[in-house]
Amino acid sequence: MYKDKQLYVAHSANGPIHIIGNMANRHGLIAGATGTGKTVTLQVLAETFSQAGVPCFMADMKGDLSGISQTGGLSKFIEKRCAEWGMDTTTLQFEGCPVRLYDVYGKQGHPMRTTIEKMGAMLLARLMELNETQTGI
């Protein structure tokens, strides 16, 4: 949520956590174990930056972030979480964000132009549908 030139990105026991818009870095890294909320964190950051008019580029190998283009809605989980934090759900506004999906094949998205050398092992392995052993070579 973008309000008063601040990017609301999370909530703690002490209240909301904001990033001041003009203090945000141009690059970031979200890391963690499976199930720790990396994808949701990226999605919230991208949505909030989009609301502030800041374009974002995110590499999404599995397509988990493509739903950012769709308008969300209030779910029981969100209602419960908002109640825990004392947030008023009636003020929430749901909207999709502008998205351009790149496709190295140029068939299901905007064509992406790169060289094999610059792709990196993980992307190349996915394109070639390599198994774990083949990827490690």
Regions found by a protein language model. Give the residues of each.
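Helical/strand "switch-coupling" subdomains that flank nucleotide/phosphate-binding cores, especially
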Residues: 83-137
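Glycine-rich phosphate-binding loop of nucleotide-binding enzymes
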Residues: 1-97
